[in-house]
Amino acid sequence: MLSFQYPDVYRDETAIQDYHGHKVCDPYAWLEDPDSEQTKAFVEAQNKITVPFLEQCPIRGLYKERMTELYDYPKYSCHFKKGKRYFYFYNTGLQNQRVLYVQDSLEGEARVFLDPNILSDDGTVALRGYAFSEDGEYFAYGLSASGSDWVTIKFMKVDGAKELPDVLERVKFSCMAWTHDGKGMFYNAYPQQDGKSDGTETSTNLHQKLYYHVLGTDQSEDILCAEFPDEPKWMGGAELSDDGRYVLLSIREGCDPVNRLWYCDLQQESNGITGILKWVKLIDNFEGEYDYVTNEGTVFTFKTNRHSPNYRLINIDFTDPEESKWKVLVPEHEKDVLEWVACVRSNFLVLCYLHDVKNTLQLHDLATGALLKIFPLEVGSVVGYSGQKKDTEIFYQFTSFLSPGIIYHCDLTKEELEPRVFREVTVKGIDASDYQTVQIFYPSKDGTKIPMFIVHKKGIKLDGSHPAFLYGYGGFNISITPNYSVSRLIFVRHMGGVLAVANIRGGGEYGETWHKGGILANKQNCFDDFQCAAEYLIKEGYTSPKRLTINGGSNGGLLVATCANQRPDLFGCVIAQVGVMDMLKFHKYTIGHAWTTDYGCSDSKQHFEWLIKYSPLHNVKLPEADDIQYPSMLLLTADHDDRVVPLHSLKFIATLQYIVGRSRKQNNPLLIHVDTKAGHGAGKPTAKVIEEVSDMFAFIARCLNIDWIP
């Protein structure tokens, strides 16, 4: 590889902060101001090296052409019924945003109901959340611009898809819950703040409040229904009970799967909703999660992890709510995790479990909890479901590494509850029968068995010669289940690659126990698990260190950056997308304070001791051995990422280039690409997705000398 001339970047050696008696230098703290001329010049100088490097990758054009060709397949959501109509999302293939369609019946003609593509020239305005009124006659929907988490809520009359004048601003991380009379909707908003709020700012998000908006009135008249002046981090989302009588308020403080649960009986609000509601504090601690399923009168069914890390269903009678009186409806499974539950046809429950990172779907009886039926499913994930208490049918969508999607429909009024294939999608150009998926369990450093999926062409020789792409996340109780990815399958098909997904601790793959095994003082387990995944792939002959790429985004960006610092010898290439890199300061920006439940917070001496040991920004060092250099690294971020603000990646790349990049033995590139009019990832237009994956895989091909296989 060629050596790189990186930009000269100012280091402020006087920027020193004292953490519990430890002096920590932060020479690139000036990059924390996104609007300064200096930061803008830094971004421009970095993109000036990276963009040509990516464009000169011989494979980039071939990859982009193939991606554009193969990604051009129809993408459907499940149909869902609202009032008397059916709705579904559909993308013909390469549309920037999927379109919402309406039908009067399943056989009826489909009409466009809402097309976000006409709201911008470049597809950067995206639908972010929506809610229909109970009778299906009114529709509220959130729009976000350029990938920001900030949302503007608008309203439509469903009949004739007529736009209404109501507009709600300063909305973020919001519920959308209509009262059943259709007169208005609960939502969340933040107070006005100094400076801008367009997704390029870094100011912290505190004091979220719950409001009720009456349709046809101005936002300034909205009714404040809940606020927590003494608890600035609390966020309270509202939901209406199935019978419309109760408002349930779920209060969260961070990202842990725990919440308080307050409720208000709307029949007690004799004058309607006029101010702060009369909240009854059913659960007033953060010792478990309570997820509302349905209720029969005052008996409420919740999915909970209270004394059940794999989750169970309990009934709580609001007239006698003592914990000793709670009844177990469906007990916790000893191994499988209960992921979600829905009530349908008034007396059925649909339960979705995760069994060794593969979904299973079951039908239970609401009155007794008894198992009635197991729906047949291949090995893979349930990625879509629709069916509410008043519906008599369900739709669910299945996907896997090699199947783009099958939607099933089941009519629950029939004697034989047999689901039928409602819609199946195929991708022309990739023959699934040429490839295989295996799941293995490898030992981590402490002996814990970690699951990993491996996808590759059938019949390959395990001689260590193949490029491999290892993906991981490992945080926030999020399970990484099989999903269909054209971009990764192109790597397998045209770059002779092996795809691996490691289900490391910190995720929710085996419930709250698995999550807790990879957070706070145990965070190093995530990095050990991931490094052991790499070692397994190498030992078994799938790949070799110089042919191995690791990739992750957000918390997964933290993962791969930390692994590069800890084991630079183990990987050939690292692609870190929108990563959390400064573990001492992350809690100071936008919604970062919510992640202290997983990471801890440097304000605490004990937490500081954990964080300083692995924080990517603070652990960059030149490898001592002469024959070891850092892997090729590409950091990706964007100007409107207000979830993980870009300063994380900017400060990290400056540090890498200074400490490692100036060394004569460092021939592998250390680069960053900062996109514009893009954010953390949600709602990213197809055109940008194609550019991004073309950059990623072109970088891998160029750095690891991979040839294109026609």
UniProtKB/Swiss-Prot annotation:
EC number(s) per entry: 3.4.21.26
Catalytic reaction(s) noted: Hydrolysis of Pro-|-Xaa >> Ala-|-Xaa in oligopeptides
UniProt KW keywords: Acetylation, Cytoplasm, Hydrolase, Protease, Serine protease
Superkingdom in the source lineage: Eukaryota
SUPFAM superfamilies the UniProt entry points to: alpha/beta-Hydrolases, Peptidase/esterase 'gauge' domain
Residues at the active site: 554 (charge relay system), 641 (charge relay system), 680 (charge relay system)
N6-acetyllysine, modified sites: 157
Cellular compartments per GO CC: cytoplasm
PTM notes: The N-terminus is blocked.
UniProt xrefs under InterPro entries: AB_hydrolase_fold (IPR029058), Pept_S9_AS (IPR002471), Pept_S9A_N (IPR023302), Peptidase_S9_cat (IPR001375), Peptidase_S9A (IPR002470), Prolyl_oligopep/macrocyclase (IPR051167)
Tissues and organs where the protein is expressed, per its UniProt entry: Ubiquitous.
UniProt keyword Signal, yes or no: no
Subcellular location, record wording: Cytoplasm
GO biological process, one term: proteolysis
Record GO terms (molecular function): serine-type endopeptidase activity
Enzyme class of the recorded protein, top EC level: hydrolase
Modification sites for N-acetylmethionine: 1
Keyword check for Hydrolase: yes
Primary location: cytoplasm
Function recorded in the entry: Cleaves peptide bonds on the C-terminal side of prolyl residues within peptides that are up to approximately 30 amino acids long.
Entry's family note: Belongs to the peptidase S9A family.
Protein name per its UniProtKB record: Prolyl endopeptidase
